[in-house]
């Protein structure tokens, strides 16, 4: 059984899987809007066979403190990654981020370039997009007009392909009950969504010189693949992985395909 270390820094719950980490490359995983480090369960075996892996719950979510600083932005998310690295004594880490977590990784590359080794951005974006805004507006209406139960019940529609939702109905209903019980305060979720809607680093993409893997699903119903294509085309040192099926959360629906590309990228020169 691999060693796991659990800790808290400035209200952020984190877990280190594997160790010791001295002299080793480390992978830091950053989740999407939901914020839970448990999102990465389908990647853990493939990664921990090779590297120590850090997961954490975003500020305001999961087991982390359930409040956010005023005027919350993606810069705060990037700063929180640095706090987790500092707590573990890491000079830098490979960062793998899904959507919001990938965007925070891009912000980290700009704000703290020396703390980032390689970066993987899954279904992310660099500037506001009309379709993303439409989806988030719908989520906001569900949350504000109906409540967390309706918000959570609708999430699979944004995240997964229809056939996968049908096949995994029992699993999704069990997860739904858990997500409703653990749902963040309304003001936290509103602030996180508004931070993502305000995120715009498009004019600075050429300043990010790190090795980056942009990974995208063609059938993502939340983030158009054109957003990932734009990232891959404008980042000076980016690789691009496109999968045909799997939805916004294809790291969950087709982990084998994603994990193979992820490991290959992180192991490469």
From Swiss-Prot:
GO terms for molecular function: hydrolase activity, acting on carbon-nitrogen (but not peptide) bonds, in linear amides. Its EC number is 3.5.1.-. It is an enzyme of class 3 (hydrolase). Pfam families: Abhydrolase_1. Keywords: Hydrolase. The keyword Cytoplasm does not apply. Residues 26-144 form the AB hydrolase-1 domain. It catalyses: carbamate + 2 H(+) = NH4(+) + CO2. GO terms for biological process: nitrogen utilization; uracil catabolic process. Involved in pyrimidine catabolism. May facilitate the hydrolysis of carbamate, a reaction that can also occur spontaneously. PANTHER family: AB HYDROLASE-1 DOMAIN-CONTAINING PROTEIN (PTHR43433:SF5), HYDROLASE, ALPHA/BETA FOLD FAMILY PROTEIN (PTHR43433). Belongs to the AB hydrolase superfamily. Hydrolase RutD family. This is Putative carbamate hydrolase RutD. It comes from Caulobacter vibrioides (strain NA1000 / CB15N) (Caulobacter crescentus).
């Amino acid at each position: 059984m691999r060693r796991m270390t659990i800790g808290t820094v400035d209200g952020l719950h984190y877990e280190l899987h594997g160790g010791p980490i001295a002299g080793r490359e480390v992978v830091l995983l950053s989740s999407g809007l939901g914020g839970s480090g448990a999102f990465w369960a389908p990647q853990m075996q493939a990664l921990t066979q090779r590297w120590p892996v850090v997961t954490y719950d975003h500020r305001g979510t999961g087991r982390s403190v359930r409040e956010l600083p005023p005027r919350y932005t993606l810069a705060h998310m990037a700063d929180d990654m640095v706090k987790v690295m500092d707590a573990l004594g890491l000079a830098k880490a490979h960062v793998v981020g899904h959507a919001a977590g990938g965007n925070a990784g891009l912000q980290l590359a700009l704000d703290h370039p020396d703390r980032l080794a390689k970066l993987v951005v899954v279904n992310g974006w660099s500037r506001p997009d009309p379709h993303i805004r439409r989806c988030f507006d719908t989520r906001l209406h569900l949350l504000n007009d109906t409540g967390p139960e309706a918000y959570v019940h609708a999430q699979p529609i944004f995240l997964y392909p229809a056939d996968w939702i049908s096949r995994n109905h029992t699993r999704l209903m069990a997860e739904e009950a858990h997500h409703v019980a653990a749902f963040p305060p309304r003001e936290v979720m509103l602030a996180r969504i508004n931070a993502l809607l305000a995120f715009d680093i498009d004019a600075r993409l050429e300043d990010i010189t790190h090795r980056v893997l942009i990974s995208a699903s063609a059938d993502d119903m939340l983030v158009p693949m054109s957003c990932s294509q734009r990232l891959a085309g404008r980042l000076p040192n980016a690789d691009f992985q496109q999968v045909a099926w799997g939805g916004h959360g294809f790291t969950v629906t087709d982990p084998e395909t994603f994990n193979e590309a992820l490991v290959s990228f992180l192991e490469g020169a």
